[in-house]
Amino acid sequence: MMRCPECSTEGWRVLPLTVGAHVKEGLWSKIKGDFYFCSLESCEVVYFNEQTVFRKGELKTRVGVKEREEPKPVCYCNRVTEKMLLEAAEKFGKEKAVEITGAGKGKWCVVTNPSGRCCHWHLERLGFPVGGEKKAAKRVEIKLDGLTCMGCVSAVKAALEEAGANVVEIGLDRAVVEVDEEAELQKLVEAVEGAGYSARLEKR
């Protein structure tokens, strides 16, 4: 893990694919290696690594958690904003608001969401429940083969989630997922193979 050079918040790793989807095209030449995402609301830094820092003004995408005015995107896959959630919560309650808006139900987060993750962390920060999920008991690393683009990554991520895994990290050659203790790990391999790629398991 690395800490943001401006606010010292611990960042989480994001793929070059994610960074490239949100940073302005003129800055693509600076995208080298993995970056880290800073989630602190008041910090202007979005992505950073040892060599490069990208701030809000250098992105073409609004980073909802860092915006002070609407629209404040929360679920990028289903185009759900903070305002939409709050309005639905006022009428139907927070739990129903998540269901009605479809927040947290997307499958392309690694590309659409600047954080490179599902928006569940953002929903929880706003006080919305993301219940119904089982707590993961173990973390598993999956070696991947045959992926060549962000479309491949998104397809494998969706397949793993359909198999019941919580995808923590994913790239062209590996994925790290969390699953229940009783989960059949071979089903994860089968899910990747069903999406048209090769995989093998390595417990962490």
Curated annotation (Swiss-Prot):
Which metal ions or organic cofactors does this protein require, according to UniProt?
Answer: [2Fe-2S] cluster
Compartment list:
Cytoplasm
Xref: InterPro entries: BFD-like_2Fe2S-bd_dom_sf (IPR041854), Heavy-metal-associated_CS (IPR017969), HMA_dom (IPR006121), HMA_dom_sf (IPR036163), Znf_CopZ (IPR040890)
Q: What is the effect of changing residue 109 to S?
A: Alters iron-sulfur binding
Q: Which residues bind Zn(2+)?
A: 4, 7, 38, 43
Q: Where does Cu cation bind?
A: 149, 152
- State any single GO MF term: 4 iron, 4 sulfur cluster binding
| Stated consequence of mutating residue 77 to S | Alters iron-sulfur binding
**Residue ranges annotated for the HMA domain, each copy included:** 138-200
Which sites bind [2Fe-2S] cluster?
75, 77, 109, 119
Per UniProt, which keywords does this protein have?
Answer: 4Fe-4S, Chaperone, Copper, Cytoplasm, Iron, Iron-sulfur, Metal-binding, Zinc
Is Iron set as a keyword in this record? yes
Query: What effect on the protein does mutating residue 119 to S have, as reported in its record?
Result: Alters iron-sulfur binding
Q: Which GO terms describe its cellular component?
A: cytoplasm
Q: What note does UniProt attach to the cofactor annotation? A: Binds 1 [2Fe-2S] cluster per subunit.
- What is the documented function of this protein? Chaperone that serves for the intracellular sequestration and transport of Cu(+). Delivers Cu(+) directly to the transmembrane transport sites of copper-exporting P-type ATPase A (CopA). Probably has a redox function due to the presence of a 2Fe-2S cluster and could reduce Cu(2+) to Cu(+).
Q: How does it assemble?
A: Homodimer or homooligomer in the presence of copper ions. Monomer in the absence of copper. Interacts with CopA probably in its Cu(+)-bound form.
- Please state what the protein is called: Copper chaperone CopZ
Q: Which organism is it from?
A: Archaeoglobus fulgidus (strain ATCC 49558 / DSM 4304 / JCM 9628 / NBRC 100126 / VC-16)
